[in-house]
Amino acid sequence: AALTSMAIGFAVTGLWWLLVTVPLIKNYKQINYVEKKEHAVRSAFRRIFETIRFIATKDKKVFFFLIAFFLYIDGVGTIIDNCINIGTDLNLSTVGQVICLLATQVVAFGGSLVFAKLSKKYDTVQLILVCIAGYFIVCLYALTLKNLIGFSFLAFGVGCFQGSIQSLSRSYFSKIIPPDNSGEYFGLYDIFSKGASFLG
């Protein structure tokens, strides 16, 4: 029964992301891009290293943001990963945990929409700080958990800021980088994101 529930959970999550990705695939158009070159791999690595050197020496705003992003996104990943461990420590049923985690994805989507609207009125950096503060409160709340109801509130809290902090970070990063070099810059962004998960 537990394996069936998990399989259903994965299937529903996959279907959910497929549905929300369709509008992007249908409507997205690449505006800034680099012309294809003969030695694509070698050229890509050369441009990446040139971008790293440029950011480290001349683009301090991007440099310091990437360092900050590396630190706080590692904390976000740790919190999300440990939700399962908390549920296990509380001896919650697998079904209950899966339902909460699925609900987290739905809440995360709604949270992203809310913060997207707020970003039109407030500074993006301030909203990122709000998300970080929200995660700090979620961590403190996690220390008081005793049952499934409490775990549900924890999942809701994580969901409120999960999609928001990721989308806000990406949005802010896109504003401070040169559009013509977005490929290299976002390549570094993803390296810092995945590197935080690996080292964390």
Q: In which residue ranges do the predicted regions lie?
A:
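Short amphipathic helix-loop junctions that connect adjacent transmembrane helices
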Residues: 81-97
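Structural signature of the two symmetry-related core transmembrane helices
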Residues: 126-141
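Intracellular juxtamembrane helix-capping segments at the cytosolic ends
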Residues: 164-177
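Helix-to-loop junctions at the C-terminal end of transmembrane segments
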Residues: 110-124
